[in-house]
Amino acid sequence: MIVGLGVDIVELARIEKSLTRFGRRFAEKVLSPEEMAAMPTLTVNYIAGRFAVKEAAVKALGTGFSQGIGPTLVETVATSGGKPQLRLHGAALQCARDLGVTSCHVSISHDRSSAVAVVVLEAL
């Protein structure tokens, strides 16, 4: 049964503006250490896609970025085949457990001006 659904669209120009202004500090504020390590350079598409997943995930959880859930507690990791997977930590993980979440589905897409992500949370 679906217990959460979230969608988010991020304008690449907004991320580019933040990177220009704040550089690596911006990326470190919104990406987990593992996401930072997986990023070869500070790329707008990578950061925008990951941020869209984070926003979609907290919408699916029904919390937004509140209740102790910050961007670094929601991360996107790739399987060996490159498929994006959601990994939650801390308050985000506890919220998912409270909802009975047993599986998460993630999709990310980009075009010239935006990144979009969809997150579906399922429970048995």
Curated annotation (Swiss-Prot):
UniProt keyword list: Cytoplasm, Fatty acid biosynthesis, Fatty acid metabolism, Lipid biosynthesis, Lipid metabolism, Magnesium, Metal-binding, Transferase
Gene Ontology biological process terms in this record: fatty acid biosynthetic process
UniProt subcellular location: Cytoplasm
Pfam families: ACPS
Binding site for Mg(2+): 8, 55
Cofactor entry: Mg(2+)
Function recorded in the entry: Transfers the 4'-phosphopantetheine moiety from coenzyme A to a Ser of acyl-carrier-protein.
Protein name: Holo-[acyl-carrier-protein] synthase
Organism the protein comes from: Desulfovibrio desulfuricans (strain ATCC 27774 / DSM 6949 / MB)
Encoding gene (name): acpS
